[in-house]
Amino acid sequence: SNLNPENMFNFIVSAFQRHTLRKLPSLNKKKYHSLEDARSVAIVFNSQESEIAEAIGILDKELKKFGISYKGLGISFTKDETTNSKLDHYPYIVQILKKETNWLSIPTIEQAENFYKGEYDILFDLSLQPSFAIEYSIKRCKCGMIVGYCPEREEMYDLCIKGGEGKTEARPSLAEYVKQSIQYLTIIKSK
């Protein structure tokens, strides 16, 4: 039957995770910011996403152009507990390993807490898959607006960049998503 100990444990963990997310207050102010007047940005991502280094490179360049400070929090859930070496040179990005989370996948290291304590005008969710640790991290941040791409988290976003809706249309690359959102955030006026 499906009730082996591992399935049972995963079921219990999943129930606790849902409960934890429900208990977290929403710190998102739903206040639109253009890149012109944003002062601080948060980036939450999965370190192992295939094009993440390119996407962060684009974002890094654009944010610097606008004089916006940013912090990034990457979750790296690999079996071998390694970070994405292509991101190691960014001073404002922390990558968290599985062993640096508790049994619920909540990051427990001080750098994560420092990230959560920040106040951000815009938060970019660059992850493309559902993930408790990512969702938890987004909910812990005080931010004006959330920009994202993950269809499963669409209700959390103030700006959801979509693509690849039709069966024939391929989903845009992560780099394309980032370019589209930067373009949009450059055009909009802050409210």
Predicted regions and their residues:
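Short, charged/polar "capping" segments at the starts of alpha-helices
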Residues: 50-52, 79-85, 155-156
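Active-site-proximal region of nucleotide-activated glycan assembly enzymes
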Residues: 8, 155-191
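Histidine-anchored nucleotide/phosphate-binding helix
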Residues: 49-67
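Structural motif
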Residues: 44-48, 75-77, 126-128
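Helix-enriched interaction subdomains in cytosolic or periplasmic regions
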Residues: 5-20
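Active-site and donor-binding regions of nucleotide-sugar-utilizing enzymes
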Residues: 98-166
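Conserved nucleotide-cofactor-binding alpha/beta core module
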Residues: 64-116
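Short, glycine-rich nucleotide/cofactor-binding loops
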Residues: 35, 41-54
